[in-house]
């Protein structure tokens, strides 16, 4: 269990484009993960990238395989 603090950012008010937030997250996107003086932007993006490409070529199941699953009942 890691202690953390959630700070809400009001996107409708443009709080993610304010200089204070841009100092934490230069792209002005959400989320921004900060641990002391260390911003974890690259680590968060790496996890996101891994989730996006979890079933591409080279893995046990590919996206093409998943796309054909709804039609397998017609083959049986």
UniProtKB/Swiss-Prot annotation:
Claim: Transferase is one of the keywords in the record: yes
Listed EC numbers: 2.5.1.18
Location within or outside the cell: Cytoplasm
Catalyzed chemical reaction(s): RX + glutathione = an S-substituted glutathione + a halide anion + H(+)
Any GO BP annotation: glutathione metabolic process
Main location as per UniProt: cytoplasm
Gene Ontology, cellular component aspect: cytoplasm
Record-stated family: Belongs to the GST superfamily. Theta family.
PANTHER family referenced in this protein's UniProt entry, alphabetically: GLUTATHIONE S-TRANSFERASE F9 (PTHR43900:SF45), GLUTATHIONE S-TRANSFERASE RHO (PTHR43900)
Name of the molecule in the record: Glutathione S-transferase
Organism: Brassica oleracea var. italica (Broccoli)
């Amino acid at each position: 269990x890691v202690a953390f603090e959630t700070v809400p950012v009001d996107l409708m008010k443009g709080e993610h484009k304010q200089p204070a937030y841009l100092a934490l997250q230069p792209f002005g996107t959400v989320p921004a993960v900060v641990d002391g003086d260390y911003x974890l932007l690259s680590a968060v993006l790496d996890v996101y990238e891994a989730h996006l490409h979890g079933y591409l070529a080279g893995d046990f199941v590919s996206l093409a395989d998943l796309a054909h699953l709804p039609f397998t009942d017609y083959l049986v």
